[in-house]
Amino acid sequence: MFQGQRGWFCGSVSQDLRQIWEDEGGMVSDVKAADFLFSCDASHPDTLRIYQSLEYIEDNATVFHAYYLAAIANTEMKNSVALGHFVLPPACLQKEIRRKIGSFIWEQDEKFQIEKHDRMASSDKENIRPTPEHKQELSKSAEHHLTRTPVIEKQMCFPLHSYPVNNMVTGYISIDALEKFLGELHDFTPGSSGYLAYHIQDEINMSAIKNKLRRKLS
């Protein structure tokens, strides 16, 4: 899937996720040569250097949560997993974003995996001492284990398949749900038509900025 593509990985990304990238034909490179930037922690020093770079400030670089790789590895329809849903914003913006849309999609799936792991561990304990009546069933179960495994993985990725129809995951709106605009389009010019545009740097509280702007405009 990533044949010939180059990816940079933050130190917060596990070796398992990096291996998925390589198994799909991707190559590991430095930041400047990379086509994709992956991280699992917006506060990690490696990722902070990206956020503070000129490329990121000028919108020439985007950081993605590396759980995207796990998502495509656990689904048969790899192209159905939207990369845009895994954009990893700076830590200073995440609290504000969660307040507006809820948990990020990778947080939802991580929680699902933990619950799935707990259920499987509990089931294993119950099956340590099978009753005589279940011995034949266990034999058949072992025989069909490989057949059932893909079904489990497919269910694990259900939130991704139903997304963005199921907007309870992150609150993003599907493009299909947007109304079509039939009027004339005009270029947006900051400072005109009653709208202003601001560039926010470093870890500034978004709510404080909004309040300051309201006082300035009132």
UniProtKB/Swiss-Prot annotation:
Residues 117-143 are annotated as: Disordered. It is found in: Chromosome, Telomere; Nucleus inner membrane. GO terms for cellular component: chromosome, telomeric region; nuclear envelope; nuclear inner membrane. Pfam families: TERB2. Disruption phenotype: Mice develop normally, exhibit no overt phenotype, but are infertile (both males and females). Gonads are characterized by the absence of post-meiotic cells. Specifically expressed in germline tissues. Keywords: Chromosome, Meiosis, Membrane, Nucleus, Telomere. Belongs to the TERB2 family. PANTHER family: TELOMERE REPEATS-BINDING BOUQUET FORMATION PROTEIN 2. This is Telomere repeats-binding bouquet formation protein 2.
